[in-house]
A protein has these predicted regions:
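Residues that mark the N-terminal boundary/hinge immediately upstream of a DNA-recognition element
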Residues: 41, 52, 78-81
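Recognition helix of helix-turn-helix/homeodomain-like DNA-binding domains
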Residues: 60-76
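N-terminal flexible/basic segments that precede or flank functional cores
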Residues: 1-40, 102-112
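DNA major-groove recognition helix of helix-turn-helix/homeodomain DNA-binding modules
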Residues: 61, 80-96
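Conserved hydrophobic/aromatic packing and binding residues within compact polymer-binding modules
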Residues: 42, 53-57, 67-70
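Short, amphipathic alpha-helical "recognition" segments used to contact nucleic acids or chromatin
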Residues: 39-47
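The alpha-helix within a helix-turn-helix
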Residues: 46, 57, 86
């Protein structure tokens, strides 16, 4: 399912149309939700630390475009990148994936 198809389906749902269950839509929606949660946490923590996107990219040895993609939720990075983000931003990231449960991402900054 591409973004346009997802957006059209979401729009139809918001208009109150009854739509048949679509596992692909649910998967894309879930991934987008996780990406947005992570992106907001990364942006907030980066700003809290007074870092620019370039500073964070340098700490992680990635391109600035990679940081922008994470913060704007255009991509859900693999676990290895999430671990590098956690180290670079001094965060604890807990990803809970359990069959049947909604996946959760908990991001905790150290107490000030």
């Amino acid at each position: 399912m591409n973004h346009s198809e997802w957006r059209t389906r979401r729009h139809r749902q918001l208009l109150g149309e009854h739509l048949d269950a679509d596992p692909e839509y649910d998967r894309v929606y879930e991934e987008a939700s996780l990406a947005m949660t992570l992106g907001k946490a990364v942006y907030d923590r980066r700003k809290q630390l007074g870092l620019s996107e370039a500073d964070l990219a340098e700490r992680m040895h990635v391109d600035v475009d990679d940081i922008e993609g994470i913060e704007t939720a255009t991509e859900l990075p693999p676990i290895a990148v999430i671990m590098r983000l956690a180290r670079a931003l001094d965060l604890t990231v807990d990803v809970h994936l359990a069959g049947g449960d909604e996946p959760t991402v908990t991001i905790v900054a150290p107490a000030a």
